[in-house]
Amino acid sequence: MLLVIDVGNTNIVLGIYDGQRLVRDWRISTDKAKTSDEYGILIRELFRGADIEFKDVKAIIISSVVPTLSGVLERLSRNYFGYSPLVVGPGIRTGMPIQYDNPKEVGADRIVNAVAGYEKYKTSLVIVDFGTATTFDYVNRKGEYCGGAIAPGLVISMEALFQRASKLPRVDIVKPPAVIARNTVNSMQAGIFYGYVGLVDEIVARMKAESKETPRVIATGGLAGLIAPESKTIEAVEEYLTLEGLRILYERNRE
């Protein structure tokens, strides 16, 4: 079995693959203070609930946008599984030309998503990933990663509103009953939700115009399912896009 680990600023997503089949997946909170032993104990409990043992895992691949946790999880891999993991970063074989001024600046998660998206659709793509930041990535019809845009994530936007405006409460991110809201909570939800739908559609529209192609638009990330139904541009939600990209990259880098 292959263990894939996607480390984000807010959540860590883990998946177990048996060949090309995703057997189980878990989402846990990112905690920069946790040690490799603490993560090891947590993963053991997750595995126990799925009737999986450490010895069942034969390889590990990690994508991380949190540098302080990269070393922690590499130690976890060696100490608990007996393997040095494959880490997504400079030098890894992606099979995708990266047309970025400095390829080392591109977040690992963005490349992983691009690889998975192009492998599935084999056409030009806009990939919208609703994470701590919301990223928009463009892959052209030749399968080249061309770059994209980065916007504050939904949760960051809502938290900023709560923290910087004294009289505004912290609220859940949900679709409100109306745009013309009749109370403060719904008003905040309307502004964030519909404002974000507009942000997504406008950036996607401009990417399409600039590219002079007709890309397929897909979304992933924890809040993709909330925004996509209201978006005029998102055509599909790929819940496991990043995990699938990690599996593909592992296969491309096997010795």
UniProtKB/Swiss-Prot annotation:
Residues that coordinate or bind ATP: D6, V7, G8, N9, T10, N11, I12, V13, T132
Cofactor(s) demanded: NH4(+); K(+)
Entry note: cofactor: A monovalent cation. Ammonium or potassium.
Residues bound to substrate: Y100, G107, A108, D109, R110, T184
Residues that hold K(+) according to the record: D129
EC number: 2.7.1.33
TM spans (from-to): none
Cellular compartments annotated: Cytoplasm
CDD domains for this protein: ASKHA_NBD_PanK-III (cd24015)
Residues annotated as signal peptide: none
Pathway annotation from the record: Cofactor biosynthesis; coenzyme A biosynthesis; CoA from (R)-pantothenate: step 1/5
Matching PANTHER family: TYPE III PANTOTHENATE KINASE (PTHR34265:SF1)
Purpose of the protein: Catalyzes the phosphorylation of pantothenate (Pan), the first step in CoA biosynthesis.
Name of the protein in its database record: Type III pantothenate kinase
